[in-house]
């Protein structure tokens, strides 16, 4: 039996059921759902006001090469992963190491953003592998204008 299996997840200020590793930079006003993995071991920056939905995984390292070479190549690959301000990461979405997601973007539920992907701001990304479906810039502008008008 694994002696650490019965230990609780390391405490974090976001969600008792989220696993946050390494030392990620997480911006002010972020919400992180239960059963998420936030891997800061290879460098991770999450901007202000992001929502990371339940079950999402954001990773900044990989042991693929180490595993496949039977540890002949005994390294853990690490790469900075960046998520811009005010991004929404959907339920069970996966963001792999080295990906850059521009501000005000949505990663749809179940999407997989591949290593080194560069997602422009205001993008809606869906699918496996994740692809930009369309721009959300006009939608965000309209929603903001409607919200401002409703407050008058």
Task: Indicate where each model-derived feature is located.
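A transmembrane-helix-recognition feature enriched in membrane-embedded lipid enzymes
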Residues: 1-11
């Amino acid at each position: 039996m694994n002696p650490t299996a019965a230990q609780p997840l390391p405490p974090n200020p976001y969600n008792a059921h989220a696993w946050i590793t390494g030392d990620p930079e997480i911006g002010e006003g972020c919400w992180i759902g239960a059963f998420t993995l936030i891997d800061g071991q290879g460098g991770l920056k999450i901007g202000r006001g992001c929502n990371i939905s339940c079950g999402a995984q954001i990773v900044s390292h990989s042991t693929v090469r180490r595993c496949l070479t039977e540890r002949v190549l005994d390294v853990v690959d690490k790469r900075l992963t960046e998520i811009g301000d005010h991004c929404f990461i959907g339920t069970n979405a996966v963001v792999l190491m080295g990906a850059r997601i521009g501000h005000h973007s949505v990663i749809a539920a179940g999407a997989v953003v591949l290593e080194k992907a560069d997602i422009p701001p205001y993008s809606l990304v869906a699918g496996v592998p994740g692809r930009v479906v369309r721009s959300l810039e006009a939608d965000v502008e309209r929603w903001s204008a409607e919200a401002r008008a409703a407050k008058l």
